[in-house]
Design a protein with these regions (language model features):
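Pyridoxal 5′-phosphate
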Residues: 2-484
């Protein structure tokens, strides 16, 4: 592995919101990270084009993460006692219900939530935000949403409700003064024209940029609005604190997913005030969450979290999140953040020195993601080469953040119009794309070195070198290995 002394010397000059990791990185990984995952997951071997097998490097952690070994083991054990939740008096039902209910309290503590907030489970973050957006659409006022949002925190709001979109800076960063100007412009209007809710990502899925969510929350509250934070790209890396309700910087709503924080089975979580959720019927209704219907079809309802659990819930997903939280807390999120940040700074510094490589990232706001391109290459081809020839998993695409990628790639209005016309005919190959390497706590300096060396070799070879070996689909733009 890379010499840690050399590593620390190289990244000393870069300013950061986090200090460098104070421990030896290799030692920390060997002693504290490696035991948390199965040997099979850490030593997963893949076959490359030359026929050799290499250890897989997972740098697509912004999409999903490998589960903790003890989470997997615990859930497997729980399956032996698995029973219906809130639906039976048998021992298996009681055991599963107790574990499921306890997971809510653990999640509430994990994000510093008030006891006056509900913890509502969903299929994923997308469904959680859709649920919140559906309920907010019943209330007068407008949603304030940024132009750097993932589609999951954009489409649910703009397709259901009146909205105002605020434009971020050319690099995707937020201007508090410009946000305040929007609040001021709407503040003295009628109730239906005022801003009722501001929603924003906690960390960008494409660059890792972290807007100042607590300062933004204070600004929203100053003008009588609520604050919604999509923290699914943040919570596994750094502490998210909703804060007490009387704190001007408190977050009124947060949403995230378990599968991005080392918990399998894909459960999403939505937290927000009881009074908000009790003020209307739940987003989804059905068996169990509305306990009685009279002969005259009068509906009697719960005013509890259970009102938002229609049907049989994904109990194993909720329990998996709770167990993952225990491990993350024991490891300490500040150490996770510093460790991952050190890997990113090391990789960032080296990639910048490779001729032909462009890194789309704010140098003083490095997080867990490095977005980049190689001159002359389609990003999707680079991702395919990394997988097929080097056993490295990254992702290339627009990452459902279309306006942000247009900013980063300087896509003109005319180009945007042409792309849109093509998409209407089913052609998606020219949708702009960027390569994203996204890091997790199980990544190592060796992973960083393998990525850096692979990118250097690809850039050196040049685009034409790969044309005989890879073919691009005329419609989708996807690259595949040419039959040989």
């Amino acid at each position: 592995m890379t010499n840690t002394f050399t590593f620390n010397a190289k990244i000393k000059q870069i300013n950061s919101h986090l200090p460098l990791f104070p421990e030896n990185l290799d030692s920390f990984w060997d002693k504290e990270i490696k035991p948390l995952f199965t040997d099979e997951s850490l030593s997963f071997m893949v076959k490359t084009l030359n026929g050799n097998y290499v250890k897989y490097v997972n740098l697509d952690n912004g999409a999903t993460t490998t589960p903790f070994a003890s989470v997997k083991q615990y859930v497997d054990q729980m399956l032996d006692t698995y029973g219906s939740v809130h639906r039976g008096s048998g021992q298996k039902s009681v055991i599963t219900t107790q574990e499921y209910d306890a997971s809510r309290n653990m999640i509430r503590d994990f994000v510093g939530s008030s006891s006056q907030n509900y913890v509502i489970f969903a299929k994923n973050t997308t469904e959680a935000i859709n649920g919140a957006a559906t309920l907010w659409a019943k209330k007068p006022g407008k949603i304030l949403v940024s132009d750097i949002e993932h589609s999951s925190n954009l489409l649910p709001w703009i397709t259901r409700d009146e909205f105002v979109q605020y434009r971020t800076q050319p690099d995707g960063s937020v201007s508090l003064s410009e946000i305040e100007n929007i609040f001021k412009a709407h503040h003295n209007r009628s109730k239906g024209e005022q801003i009722k809710l501001l929603t924003i990502t906690g960390a960008s899925t494409i660059t890792g940029y972290r807007p100042p969510i607590y300062e933004i929350a204070a600004l929203a509250h100053r003008y009588g609005a609520k604050m919604f934070a999509d923290v699914c790209q943040l919570i596994q890396h750094e502490r998210v604190d909703m804060r007490p309700d009387d704190d001007p910087c408190h977050l009124d709503f947060v949403a995230f997913s378990g599968h991005k924080m080392y918990a399998p089975y894909g459960t999403g979580v939505l937290l927000g005030p009881k009074e908000f959720f009790d003020s209307s019927y739940p987003y989804q209704i059905g068996g169990g969450n509305l306990p009685y219907i009279t002969r005259n079809l009068e509906i009697k309802r719960f005013y509890t979290e259970r009102a938002h659990d229609p049907g049989t819930p994904n109990a194993m997903g909720a329990i998996a999140i709770a167990k993952s939280i225990q491990i993350i807390e024991a490891l300490e999120r500040s150490r996770i953040a510093q460790y991952e940040h050190s890997l990113v700074e090391f990789t960032f510094t080296r990639l910048q020195n490779i001729p032909g490589v462009k890194v789309y990232i704010l140098g003083d706001n490095l997080a867990h993601v490095i977005p980049f391109d190689i001159d002359g290459f389609d990003g999707r081809l680079v991702a395919e080469i990394l997988a097929q020839e080097y056993g490295i998993g990254v992702r290339a695409g627009a990452f459902c953040t279309y306006e942000y990628i247009r900013k980063l790639k300087n896509i003109s209005d005319e180009q945007d119009l042409e792309i849109a016309k093509e998409v209407e005919t089913g052609i998606t190959r020219n949708i702009p794309s960027i390569i994203r390497a996204s890091f997790a706590v199980y990544n190592t300096l060796e992973d960083c070195d393998r990525l850096i060396n692979a990118i250097a070799q690809i850039a050196k070879n040049g685009f034409d070198y790969y044309l005989p070996y890879y073919t691009q689909d005329e419609i989708t733009g996807v690259w595949t290995v040419t039959d040989r």
